[in-house]
């Protein structure tokens, strides 16, 4: 039985900030970075036992300002990708998979756009980004996005995830209505 992480550490990135991370699963398994949602942190492992049996070395960094990671004033999604690259270098990872849960999804999209040569695979699970910008109900919602948000939205569309997000949102809404 896995009682805790294999490793729970802090890396000092180039600008001196603390980037905390924990490793779960199989220490010699295939490396996969898991980008947590909000308000989670590195200590939330989806299922450490299953992760280990699957032969996965799951590395969960705390996003800036979460857990033991320092906040980063003026951070961008591209600067997050740079942090991920520094973490990969420190852990000796040439290539790795990456998956984002919920609010972690946009961070994965940024890594896919910025450091694709480092990634073996990228996945976004249960992300509500598209649902937040329901253009039918909020026609001026795109005006609220900054350049970075537009970049991520363009990437979501380019990857064909927009329709999947709409489908997921509709299924989720139907499920919630069934509970009420």
Each model region followed by its residue ranges:
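Conserved acidic catalytic loop of the alpha/beta-hydrolase fold
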Residues: 79-97
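Short glycine-enriched, charge-decorated loop/helix-capping segments at active-site entrances
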Residues: 71-76
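Conserved hydrolase catalytic core segment
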Residues: 94-137
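Hydrophobic/aromatic ligand-binding patch that stacks against planar heteroaromatic rings
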Residues: 50, 87, 110-111
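N-terminal cap/lid segment of alpha/beta-hydrolase-fold proteins
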Residues: 1-23
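Conserved HGGG/HGGXW glycine-rich cap/lid loop of the alpha/beta-hydrolase fold
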Residues: 15-70
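Alpha/beta-hydrolase-fold enzymes
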Residues: 120-180
């Amino acid at each position: 039985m896995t009682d805790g992480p294999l490793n729970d550490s802090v890396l000092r990135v180039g600008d001196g900030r603390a980037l905390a991370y924990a490793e779960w699963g199989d220490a010699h398994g295939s490396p996969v970075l898991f980008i947590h949602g909000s308000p989670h942190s590195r200590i939330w492992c989806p299922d450490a036992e299953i992760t280990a049996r699957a032969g996965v070395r799951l590395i969960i960094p705390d996003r800036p300002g979460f857990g033991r990671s320092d906040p980063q004033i003026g951070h961008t999604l591209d600067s997050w990708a740079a942090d991920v690259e520094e973490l990969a270098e420190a852990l000796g990872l040439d290539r790795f998979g990456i998956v984002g849960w919920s609010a972690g999804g946009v961070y994965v999209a940024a890594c896919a756009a910025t450091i694709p040569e480092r990634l073996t695979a990228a996945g976004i699970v249960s992300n509500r980004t598209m649902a937040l910008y329901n253009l039918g109900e909020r026609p001026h919602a795109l005006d609220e996005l900054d350049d970075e948000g537009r970049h991520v939205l363009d990437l979501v569309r380019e990857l064909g995830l927009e329709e999947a997000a709409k489908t997921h949102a509709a299924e989720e809404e139907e499920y919630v209505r069934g509970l009420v």
